[in-house]
Amino acid sequence: SMTKKMVALCACPMGLAHTFMAAEAIEVEAKNRGYEYKVETQGSDGVQNKLSRNDIEEADFIIHAIAVTPLEMERFDGKEVYEVGLQEIIKNVSGVFDEIEADLNN
C-alpha cells in the first residue's frame, strides 16, 4: 500500500500528563497528514500500546519524544530515529513533522 506509516515512542518519568499530551499531539498530526500511526507511551502507569518489532520495521519514520531512556531500546537498533523533546512536540508538532518530511524528501 502507498499509505505512509509512522510510529512514535513517548516516555516521561514525570507522571502522565506530558507523555499523553505528546502522544495525543503526534496522533492528531499523523492522522491529519494521512499517516497510519501507532504511538507507544511509557509513563508512571507502565507501557501502553507497545510497538512490536514489526511496527518498527514497517514505519517510514520513527519519533522518540522522550525525557528518559525508554525501556527496550534494542527494538530500534539499526533504525533511524528522530529524537525530539516532549515540550517541542507539545508546542509545535506540525513543525516537527514538517522538518522530518523535508528530511525524508531530501
Tell what function each PLM region has.
Residues 7, 81-106:
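Ser/Thr/Gly-rich flexible loops in soluble cytosolic domains mediating phosphotransfer, phosphorylation
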Residues 9-30:
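Glycine-rich phosphate/diphosphate-binding loop of Rossmann-like nucleotide-binding domains
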Residues 22-27, 80-81, 99:
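Short, solvent-exposed amphipathic alpha-helical segments in soluble enzyme
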Residues 32-59:
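N-terminal beta-loop-helix "entrance" segment that forms/cooperates
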Residues 59, 78-79:
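Short, well-ordered alpha-helix to beta-strand connector turns
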Residues 66-71:
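Short, polar loop motifs at secondary-structure junctions
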